[in-house]
């Protein structure tokens, strides 16, 4: 939160602050988005205001860190169950990813889904491969022009049957209820990230499938 924003807020009567994706305060506040650290000033500027943080992925340590960084030590914590019984989880050792992803996508030609990749180049390569197989795949990564990312995101949100092939740059704030599958072509950065990313599937309560491909490292 910038000084300009804080100055503007200081002249406004505010009863409540709602912070979505609150885990970012802990995950990104130190290096990637230092502005998150500034959120601690809210409780000092508005000591009587309610500060509410919402996240789908915060373990006990993360929750405590969020409270600490918000300087909100008298907080009440509400935790809902993490079980998503409508999600089917599959984990496979990566062998031939092209063959494995095509098997996973069988009978999903008109369904919306997300495939997560580690690199920007991989999103382009996987999209090109799937388009040649008659799927409607579009890439999404931070290296694209903002207008391209916006256009691709709007296509995904407004049309059915689109496969978004993306880095983790895609997903924050995305709420499309009928995503039927999420695949990872590599291991996510953490269990929390994995849970959040597959959690974008099946939000309508109907069955959805996930696939995680991993490489086995042999140490000699």
Question: Language-model features: where?
Answer:
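Helicase motor core with emphasis on the C-terminal RecA-like subdomain
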Residues: 1-218
């Amino acid at each position: 939160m910038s000084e300009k924003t804080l100055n503007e807020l200081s002249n406004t009567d505010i009863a409540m602050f709602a912070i979505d994706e609150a885990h970012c305060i802990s995950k990104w506040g130190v290096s990637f988005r230092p502005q998150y650290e500034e959120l601690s000033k809210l409780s000092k500027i508005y000591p009587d205001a309610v500060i509410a943080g919402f996240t789908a992925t915060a373990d006990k340590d993360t929750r405590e860190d969020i409270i600490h960084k918000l300087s909100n030590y008298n907080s009440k914590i509400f935790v809902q169950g993490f079980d998503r019984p409508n999600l089917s989880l599959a984990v496979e050792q990566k062998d031939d990813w092209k063959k494995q992803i095509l098997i996973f996508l069988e009978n999903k030609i008109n369904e919306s889904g997300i495939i997560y990749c580690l690199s920007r180049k991989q999103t382009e390569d996987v999209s090109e491969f799937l388009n040649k197989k008659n799927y409607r795949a579009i890439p999404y990564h931070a290296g694209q022009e903002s207008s391209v990312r916006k256009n691709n995101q709007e296509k995904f949100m407004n049309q059915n049957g689109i496969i978004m092939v993306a880095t983790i740059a895609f997903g924050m704030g995305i709420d499309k209820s009928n995503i039927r599958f999420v695949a990872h072509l590599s291991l996510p950065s953490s269990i929390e990230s994995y849970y959040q990313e597959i959690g974008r599937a099946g939000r309508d309560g109907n069955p959805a499938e996930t696939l995680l491909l991993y490489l086995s490292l042999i140490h000699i």
